[in-house]
Curated annotation (Swiss-Prot):
The modification S-(dipyrrolylmethanemethyl)cysteine is found at C240. The porphobilinogen subunits are added to the dipyrromethane group. GO terms for biological process: protoporphyrinogen IX biosynthetic process. Its EC number is 2.5.1.61. Pfam families: Porphobil_deam, Porphobil_deamC. This is Porphobilinogen deaminase.
Length: 304
């Protein structure tokens, strides 16, 4: 019997996503034994500083990639929004699974919407993208850093440290916590991180056998959307921890991509969008990025 080992972070959401991939692989490849290799990453362990301060969301990948290089794992499963814009050699992404809900969620025990929050309410998020959109909608709010896995963040809310927090809808839904969503923060008024809600599977590009096993999980329509979003981010010279948002959707046989660059300090937002071919997501991403640059995005990004 062939065995495939999946490197994964230890958080409940990471384990859910990895088991979801494992179940899909078992269904596609009867007789394949799939096992999880849970690992702790520096991004999970250092919670008293922002991700940007300790090296960015790529920290969630490094230990998993090292496990693949050592031969301790065959592949790794990631939230695609945490994957750096460029992968180190020899790594590739043979599978992007069908996307979940890309929207953000307002979570509160007392208030049913962003508009219902009282003046000066304390809202928890460490995401500059979320902070920028919160400041644009409600400049009176007190925004407070909040890190940790989904359950840790919910516990901090429940302990009274915040009036509300902002999380990804997909993470809550995957953990069976749909009832915690007070309000969806949705397009076009509110845009998610590039590739939010999508799960990516990474392996070594020089391992043809593993690549072939994983490629059957690839969802082409999701891949086109998230590749356009990430192409826009790359063209902006962005990363996983800048106030950049993007969302692509299918319209007929092509894609419609919306992009945003914001300022977490004063809530200024710049938007641009374009239609394009799903066969040239790089071009679509570049055109939306250029639209943002034409409206002053470079100045906002330079102020970071």
């Amino acid at each position: 019997m062939t065995t495939l080992r999946i490197a994964t972070r230890k958080s409940p959401l990471a384990l859910w996503q990895s088991e979801h991939v494992a179940a899909a692989l078992r269904q596609h490849h009867p007789g394949l034994e799939v096992v999880l290799v849970p690992m702790s990453t520096r991004g999970d362990e250092v919670l008293d500083r922002s991700l940007a301060a300790i090296g960015g969301k790529g920290l969630f990948l490094k230990e998993l990639e090292l496990a693949m290089l050592r031969g301790d794992a065959d592949c790794a499963v990631h939230s695609f929004k945490d994957v750096p814009m460029e992968l180190d050699d020899p790594f590739v992404l043979p599978a992007i699974l069908e996307r979940g809900d890309p929207a953000d969620a307002l979570v509160s025990n007392l208030y049913a919407s962003l508009q219902a929050l009282p003046l000066g309410a304390r809202v928890g998020t460490s995401s500059l993208r979320r902070q920028a959109q919160l400041r644009a909608a409600r400049p009176d709010l007190e925004l407070i850093d909040l890190r940790g896995n989904v359950n840790t963040r919910l516990a901090k809310l429940d302990n009274g440290g915040y009036d509300a927090i902002v999380l990804a809808c997909a993470g809550l839904q995957r953990l069976g916590l749909d009832e915690r969503i007070s309000a969806r923060l949705d397009a076009p008024e509110w845009l998610p991180a590039p590739a939010q809600g999508a799960v990516a599977v990474e392996c070594r590009g020089d391992d043809a056998r593993i690549h072939s096993l994983l490629a059957v999980l690839d969802a082409g329509r999701t891949r086109a959307c998230v590749e356009a979003e990430r192409a826009m981010n790359r063209a902006l010279h962005g990363s996983c921890h800048v106030p950049v948002a993007a969302l692509a959707r299918w319209e007929g046989e092509g894609l419609f991509l919306q992009g945003m660059v914001g300022s977490a300090s004063d809530g200024r937002l710049i938007h641009a969008d374009a239609h394009g071919s799903a066969d040239d997501t790089e071009d679509l991403g570049r055109r939306v990025a250029q639209g943002l640059f034409d409206k002053g995005a470079a100045q906002l990004l330079a102020a970071l």
